[in-house]
Amino acid sequence: MEINIIAVGKIKTGYIDEGIAEFLKRLQPYTKVNINEIADEKVPTNPSKAEQEIVKKKEGERILASLTERTYVIALDVKGKPMTSTGLAKSIKNLQIQGNSSITFIIGGALGLGKEVLNKADFRLSMSHMTFTHQMARLIILEQVYRAFKIIHGEPYHL
C-alpha cells in the first residue's frame, strides 16, 4: 500500500515540519508515503465568491494534473463524512483487501477544494467540524494514517 498526500501550499512552520518528519519516519515500516506540494494561489484580501472560485479552480487544476490513474482519492473536506481512527483503519484495510495499492489524500489551500476536485474524489473525509490550516491538516492526517496502520497490525499506539 502506498499513501500519497497532495497538499496545496508549503509548510512554513518548523514545529509542523518536525512533526511531519517524525510521522514519515514512523510510517516507514508500514507503507511508502509520498507528499506532493502544489503551489498555492495568492488569495486577494476580502475575495468575492467569484475570486474564491477562480483560486480554487486554479489550485484544483494543479491537483488533478498530479493525480495518478490508479489511486483511491480521499478529499479532506469539512463537509465530508466524519470517521473515527478505528473507522479509518478499517477503511484502509478494506481498500487493501479490494486490491487498491494506492490511496491519495488531498488537502486544499486556504479556501478549500474546488468542485472539480471534490467530484473526482472517491470519498470525502471530514477530520473535524472545525477548520484547520492546510499545514495542520497535513500533520494530523499523517498522524491518523500512522495510527491506522498500528491498529491494522494489532499494535498498541503510544506517542
What kind of region is each of these model predictions?
Residues 1-27:
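N-terminal beta1-alpha1 ligand-phosphate binding loop
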Residues 6, 34-36:
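General small-molecule cofactor/ligand-binding pocket signal
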Residues 39-101:
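S-adenosyl-L-methionine/SAH cofactor-binding core of RNA-modifying enzymes
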Residues 97-106, 128-134:
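Short, acidic/small-residue loops that bind anionic groups at enzyme active sites
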Residues 5, 74, 108, 141:
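Conserved RecA-like P-loop NTPase ATPase core
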Residues 11, 78-81, 109-111:
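Short glycine-rich anion-binding loops that position phosphate/pyrophosphate groups of nucleotides
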Residues 31, 70-71, 121:
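Short, well-ordered alpha-helix to beta-strand connector turns
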Residues 115-159:
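Structured adenosyl-cofactor binding patch, chiefly the S-adenosyl-L-methionine
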